[in-house]
Amino acid sequence: MSKQQIGVVGMAVMGRNLALNIESRGYTVSVFNRSREKTEEVIAENPGKKLVPYYTVKEFVESLETPRRILLMVKAGAGTDAAIDSLKPYLEKGDIIIDGGNTFFQDTIRRNRELSAEGFNFIGTGVSGGEEGALKGPSIMPGGQKDAYELVAPILTKIAAVAEDGEPCVTYIGADGAGHYVKMVHNGIEYGDMQLIAEAYSLLKGGLNLSNEELANTFTEWNNGELSSYLIDITKDIFTKKDEDGNYLVDVILDEAANKGTGKWTSQSALDLGEPLSLITESVFARYISSLKAQRVAASKVLSGPKAQPAGDKAEFIEKVRRALYLGKIVSYAQGFSQLRAASDEYHWDLNYGEIAKIFRAGCIIRAQFLQKITDAYAENADIANLLLAPYFKKIADEYQQALRDVVAYAVQNGIPVPTFSAAVAYYDSYRAAVLPANLIQAQRDYFGAHTYKRTDKEGIFHTEWLE
């Protein structure tokens, strides 16, 4: 009896759609789910597909060609460990487990180490694109043993999204947890993008009182230019969608933004690495404060503040917000890629930042036209410390910073919260400042804790008895 070329464990929507994607590229696929009903459901809903169901782990593993290639699409955390433990008794040395879940990168590092010691290969793989991407072509970020990756690369290359230039949106990222780390930062950037867009929406509503149709038209125009991206594209559609009662749906959606924790992981890692990931972290905090709905409603009746005044000329203000949004987006990506550099150094991954930007160009949630600009920047200078220093991004910052400053000033004066726009200005000015007031902080630390300090006028480490 012939054996299948790859197996997929986990028949929730992402696992199901990836299995169908793989099958559609000409591969035979074994499928397994912990609950029999899920597997039966997938088979019943997809007659004629080369999906072969198995109902015990042993039969599933034995159905695969060697070295076995097994894609795990199960709940991250304990669920992943349990799935691996159930597979191990039936695996042989050299078999490959691919974890395609939203896994914390430190867990991937641990699993890679443990499984390697037992002779198995483990590829922690970030998969972005949601349900549709999984079925039609996601952006794929694999990390682990390079030789094991080569054995699964043909499949991953065939199922990945394809950019406009014909290149598949998959590349080997690096050792152990590198793939899941890049996916984590991708998700952090996604948080930043979404919050920046939400603040632009708030400014256009609060400052110009634009109707939903006007908002949709504005975002349609934006999507035809520098801001062309998946998130801008779907946002224009959201503005005009109506419910069964004829109401604009976005206007009746509760203003509490949920999260699954991946943005938090990105910010936690930034703290561990000493990286100033301020904009993305503010986007995480913005979701947290949005969840305090009852407190916010109560506070709105107690705490005073300015009432938003008209922002002036409509076309002029819309253009200012557009420019502010684009520069804010650049700052967000500059922070994210700076963190990737710090992580690459810390974990010895040797990341290729230009290649990472390339695989974000299609399939994933943050896909955008300007990602090619990032690839170009790293092609010109692979060692550039920060994307803001690249010629294209410096030019945009020179031209657009006044709009960002004007928009933030308007928002502050009119009581419109813009945490990520504000963070973009603060980061930009801090990064370009040759001198910051941190000298005073060092003096304070030395005063109360004898933490010492360095001087600008002489070498050495100093401590002062401040009360003498």
Swiss-Prot record:
Which PROSITE patterns does its entry note? 6PGD (PS00461)
Report whether Zinc-finger shows up as a keyword of the record. no
Q: Where does NADP(+) bind?
A: G10, M11, A12, V13, M14, G15, N33, R34, S35, V74, K75, A76, N102
Organism, scientific name: Salmonella typhimurium (strain LT2 / SGSC1412 / ATCC 700720)
Pfam families recorded: 6PGD (PF00393), NAD_binding_2 (PF03446)
Q: Which InterPro entries does the record associate with it? A: 6-PGluconate_DH-like_C_sf (IPR008927), 6PGD_dom2 (IPR013328), 6PGDH_C (IPR006114), 6PGDH_Gnd/GntZ (IPR006113), 6PGDH_NADP-bd (IPR006115), 6PGdom_BS (IPR006184), NAD(P)-bd_dom_sf (IPR036291), Pgluconate_DH (IPR006183)
- Report what the protein is called: 6-phosphogluconate dehydrogenase, decarboxylating
Q: Which GO terms describe its cellular component?
A: cytosol
- GN (gene name): gnd
Subunit info here reads: Homodimer.
Documented EC number(s): 1.1.1.44
The catalytic activity, as recorded, is:
6-phospho-D-gluconate + NADP(+) = D-ribulose 5-phosphate + CO2 + NADPH
Which SMART domains does the record associate with it? 6PGD
